[in-house]
A protein has these predicted regions:
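Bacterial N-terminal signal peptides
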Residues: 8-18
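Carbohydrate-interacting regions of secretory-pathway proteins
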Residues: 21-248
């Protein structure tokens, strides 16, 4: 069974890698980041991650050759960059090439002060990618089916509502550190149903049972506060969204 699973994942990896290289425009998706600047986005310093600047700045964010680059602007000071537009039901996809160390996150239906359903981008020891977390929502849910070890090539599967679909030994093949990998998240309804993927493979699925957050909000990316990550970067490109709201 493990051999069959490994072959399936390897095939999925090779197919998805070829697709990413060509970067075709998926039906129904529209880009929400241009190649030059943050038009359509703005930096918010209203989250708790901007306390080091007394909420005056929200980290350092620039766009260079189509890549959104973020870091702490002073030691310990992060924040979010959030879309001007608000979204309800949608699927968002992007490519990531972050340094291993800074804590980030993909915020779904985010408020200006960073309350959101988060698809985690905790790209550091003991962190995970694409688990689901209630940012500013009492820390619930907090579900992940694996965590990183001390090295980016090491992962440990954990018990979760959705089993970890990748063999631990195959992780270095499935996830290509310091290359572009695709992350994807879908959120529909309220209470929301959230699904996440890495490189085309479903990682987590979560059904919330209560209405605890507005049905619309921004799409945001985070640089976490704390520590000193002024010389470590998060990088995102090819950010695109597919609207899934039911037509009236």
């Amino acid at each position: 069974m493990k051999t069959i699973q490994f072959i399936r994942l390897t095939t999925a990896f090779l197919c998805s890698a070829a697709a990413f290289a060509a970067e075709p425009q998926e039906p129904g998706f529209e880009p929400i980041l241009n190649w030059r600047n943050l038009d359509g986005w703005h930096v918010s310093a209203k989250t708790g991650h901007s306390r080091a600047s007394k909420n005056k700045t929200g980290g350092k964010w620039i766009v260079k050759n189509g890549v959104l680059i973020g870091r702490q602007d002073i030691p310990g000071n992060g924040g979010i960059v959030i879309t001007d537009e608000q979204f309800g039901d949608f699927e968002v996809a992007l490519e990531m090439r972050n340094d291993f160390g800074p804590d980030s996150g993909l915020f779904l239906r985010s408020t200006e002060d960073g309350k959101a359903w988060q698809a985690m981008i905790d790209y550091h020891a003991n962190g995970n990618l694409m688990g689901v977390y209630g940012e500013g929502l009492g820390g619930k849910p907090n579900v992940a089916n694996y965590h990183f070890g001390e090295k980016v090539t090491e992962v440990k599967a954990e018990e979760a509502p959705v089993p970890f679909p990748v063999l631990e030994a195959s992780w270095p093949l499935f996830w290509r550190h310091m290359e572009w990998n695709e992350l994807r998240a879908r959120i529909v309804n309220n209470p929301p149903h959230i699904t996440t993927w890495i490189n085309g493979v479903k990682i987590m699925e979560w059904q919330e049972t209560e209405v605890r957050h507005p049905a619309k909000g921004g799409i945001a990316l985070q640089v976490h506060g704390g520590g000193d990550h002024t010389r470590e970067f998060v990088r995102y490109r090819n950010i695109r969204v597919k609207r899934l709201d039911k037509k009236q």
